[in-house]
Regions:
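Loop-to-transmembrane helix boundary motifs in multi-pass membrane proteins
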Residues: 6, 12-14, 20, 143, ...
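Helix-loop-helix connectors at the membrane interface of multi-pass transporters/channels
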Residues: 4, 108-141, 245-249, 254, ...
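Membrane-embedded translocation segments of transport machinery
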Residues: 3-7, 170, 174-322, 326, ...
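C-terminal membrane-solvent junction of multi-pass transporters and transport-like membrane proteins
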Residues: 89-94, 340-352, 383-443
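Select transmembrane alpha-helical segments in multipass membrane proteins
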Residues: 6-17, 42-45, 84-98, 147-153, ...
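Membrane-interface "cap" regions at the ends of multi-pass membrane proteins
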Residues: 1-28, 57-62, 66-79, 83-88, ...
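Transmembrane helix-boundary motif of multi-pass solute transporters/channels
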Residues: 12-49, 199, 237-243, 254-257, ...
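Inter-helical loop and helix-membrane interface segments of multi-pass membrane transporters/permeases
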Residues: 4-5, 33-37, 67-92, 105-166, ...
Length: 452
């Protein structure tokens, strides 16, 4: 029987968990959704939902982890009533982690590729939009180039995790997240010096009631709800595992609030980098891979010192995606160590092989198998993402929630006692009806909306 590892420091726990929550979505989705939904008002609604919906579910995942000191399946088993079947969700959660990694590794590989391309000067100053955009289509058409960067990312990730919790994940996350927070400030300050900065920031953050009316307040509310929910990657035991490693000195709501604050800081700052830059160069702020790999490189090649700013931006993106990858790798390894009694090295090796094979369809989906259309005409990446984002995250969160607030599960009192252990922000007992009756409806709404 091995003694369970734990984080060396509170800061380590917060930065690892924030690193897991902070990913590509903070940069390629949040700013765009803010702009589309009327700026400042959306941000306020987003914060309301983050506190009212994201934070409670975050504390639930952490509570299950901290009370059980176990990974996904055994965590449920330790807390559920004998004979009940909650732990089956643990398997679904781990499946979700594997599935997320099936495409996230490819996208993270793209970030590293672009960091490298800017670093070596492949993007020349003054390239035309055509040429800058062609770099991405050429990358997608080239399975060898894409595989190389994906494989590098996976091997590096498992190498980090094979070194132990404190010497691997925690140490590297501290360095990467500190660098990420530094980089994002430097990049934002630089964006403020551009000619169209004022206009960009105004569009981004000043509440625009005209847009709100056009979009419809109901749609703005539901967009804010979705963004607040998805930003923390809840529902696949990604946070549960860090709960199982954390200390008991601080309350879960307090620690959760810090994770939410860091996540929101990065999301809002990303917009302060992107909007001024796009407005200064007269390009439309889009979302998704197009924004990151076509629009922004286009901006950088026309910018004074663009090679440096492009390199720094993609270093930031590499850290944002890699911090999520090593956090999820830690989870699937911990699951194998718990369930099958493997040591860390074996867990790293076996999972490295599994993830490398499982990541190939996503790489090939853009070239060799580009005619392949799966769920509703989606390509491989979008199909994998649909299963994770529309089904497993909201579905899993709903199960964690019901487990923590119903008498058939762990029960509200047990959850509350665990969450409120330690100093810091406490959850009021009076919130029980809200947790039991309102929250499940909100999450069910997100689940149904995502599936129709």
């Amino acid at each position: 029987f091995m003694k369970r590892e734990s984080f060396k420091s509170r800061l380590g726990f917060i930065l690892v968990s924030a690193g897991c929550a902070i990913g590509i979505g903070n940069v390629w989705r949040f700013p765009y959704v803010v702009g589309e939904n009327g700026g400042g008002l959306f941000v306020i609604l987003y914060l309301v939902f983050l506190i009212a919906m994201g934070l409670p579910v975050l504390t639930m995942e952490l509570a299950v982890g901290r009370a059980s000191r176990k990974s996904a399946v055994l965590g449920y088993k330790a807390l559920e009533k004998p004979g009940s079947k909650w732990h089956l969700h643990g398997w679904a959660a781990i499946f979700g982690c594997y599935m997320l990694m099936m495409y996230y590794t490819t996208v993270s590989g793209w970030m590293v590729t672009y960091f490298y391309k800017f670093l070596i000067g492949e993007f020349q100053a003054g390239m035309d939009a055509e040429a800058a955009g062609a770099v991405f289509s050429n990358l997608l058409a080239d399975p060898l180039q894409m595989s190389f960067w994906m494989i590098l990312t996976v091997i590096l990730g498992f190498f980090v995790c094979s070194r132990g919790l404190q010497n691997g994940l925690e140490k590297i996350s501290k360095v990467m997240m500190s660098a990420l927070l530094g980089l994002i400030v430097i990049l934002a300050v630089h964006s403020f010096t551009l000619s169209g900065a004022g206009e960009g920031v105004r569009f981004y953050l000043i509440p625009n009631m005209e847009t709100v009316r056009e979009v419809g307040i109901g749609n703005v509310v539901s967009a804010a709800m979705n963004q607040a929910f998805f930003t923390l990657s809840l529902g696949v035991a990604a946070m549960e595992i860090f709960g199982s490693y954390m200390g008991r000195d601080n309350s879960l709501a307090g620690e959760g609030a810090r994770i939410c604050a860091l996540d929101t800081f990065v999301a809002i700052m990303a917009g302060l980098i992107i909007f001024p830059a796009c407005f200064s160069y007269g390009v439309e702020v889009g979302a998704g891979p197009k924004l990151i790999f076509i629009t922004l490189p286009n901006v950088f090649v026309n910018m004074e010192g663009g090679r440096i700013w492009g390199t720094l931006f993609f270093l930031f993106m590499t850290f944002a995606s890699f911090s999520t990858i090593i956090a999820v790798f830690e989870n699937i390894m911990s699951f194998c160590m718990d369930m099958f009694g493997w040591d860390r090295k074996k867990a790293a090796l076996v999972n490295c092989v599994i993830i490398l094979i499982a990541s190939m369809p996503c790489v090939l989906g853009y070239n060799v198998w580009s005619d392949l259309h799966l769920i509703g005409g989606r390509d491989v990446l979008d199909s994998e993402d649909f299963i994770v984002s529309n089904l497993l995250l909201p579905g899993g969160s709903l199960i964690y929630l019901l487990f923590c607030v119903t008498k058939w599960g762990w029960g509200f009192d047990n959850y509350l006692e665990e969450a409120n252990t330690g100093k810091g922000l406490k959850i009021a007992k009076g919130l029980k009806p809200y947790f039991q009756f309102v929250l499940p409806v909100l999450i069910l709404f997100i689940l149904i909306q995502g599936l129709i």
